[in-house]
């Protein structure tokens, strides 16, 4: 069957949430301008899964419409009732590198107890590359949730602030090998003599994946 704006709109207007999901998945096969207009009403759909999928698509369909994407995504981040949708909004804001959204991301981070939302925000801060995110990432390093802590380690590397090196060094002894692995990647990005020393230490790590990644970073950044 040929996919047309009319056929997709029919799916999006269906009372069946399965049809609406199908319509959302077909939007990427349409002209971006048309698809973006058709996408927007679905972010307030009655069905959580439909809203989640709709919000997630802003990462790709919203590239040419950043102002509108910012408006819609911040609204969903702050006011959607479902943590999954809030997290998807944070992911999309990061993917679109909408640094202007930082105050909204910080507000949501501090006003939620949902780990998934906090995790998505911390991951997004690395993609945003906004220096205002440094203090929040520093705070997240002390999270009791290992996934949030690991995301903070990664995002500090992406942010590129050399002050992060001193904060990250203690994680060379973290019992979770995945934290040490992410640490290596971040130290590789941050560079500097202290980073090289830690990478040399981790090149002898008992976990092969960690040791190999450290050796690779030493070669790339020597």
Regions found by a protein language model. Give the residues of each.
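Non-membrane alpha-helical segments in proteins
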Residues: 18-26, 40-41, 48-60, 87-92
């Amino acid at each position: 069957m040929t996919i047309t704006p009319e056929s997709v709109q029919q799916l999006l207007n269906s009372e069946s949430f399965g049809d609406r999901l199908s319509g959302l998945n077909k939007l990427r096969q349409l002209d971006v301008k048309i698809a973006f207009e058709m996408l927007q009403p679905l972010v307030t759909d009655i069905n959580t899964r439909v809203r989640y999928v709709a919000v997630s698509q802003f990462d790709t369909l919203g590239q040419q419409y950043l102002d509108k994407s910012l408006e819609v995504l911040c609204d969903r981040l702050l006011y959607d009732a479902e943590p999954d949708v809030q997290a998807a909004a944070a992911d999309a804001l990061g993917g679109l590198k909408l640094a202007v959204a930082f105050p909204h991301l910080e507000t949501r981070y501090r006003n939620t107890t949902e780990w998934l939302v906090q995790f998505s925000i911390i991951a997004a801060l690395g993609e945003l590359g906004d220096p205002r995110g440094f203090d929040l990432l520093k705070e997240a390093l002390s999270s009791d949730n290992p996934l949030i802590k690991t995301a903070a380690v990664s995002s500090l590397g992406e942010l590129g602030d050399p002050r992060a090196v001193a904060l990250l060094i203690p994680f060379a002894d973290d019992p979770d090998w995945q934290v040490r692995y992410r640490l290596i990647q971040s130290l590789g990005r941050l560079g500097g003599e202290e980073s090289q020393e830690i990478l040399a230490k981790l090149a002898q790590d008992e976990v092969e994946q960690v040791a190999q990644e450290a050796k690779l970073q030493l070669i790339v950044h020597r």
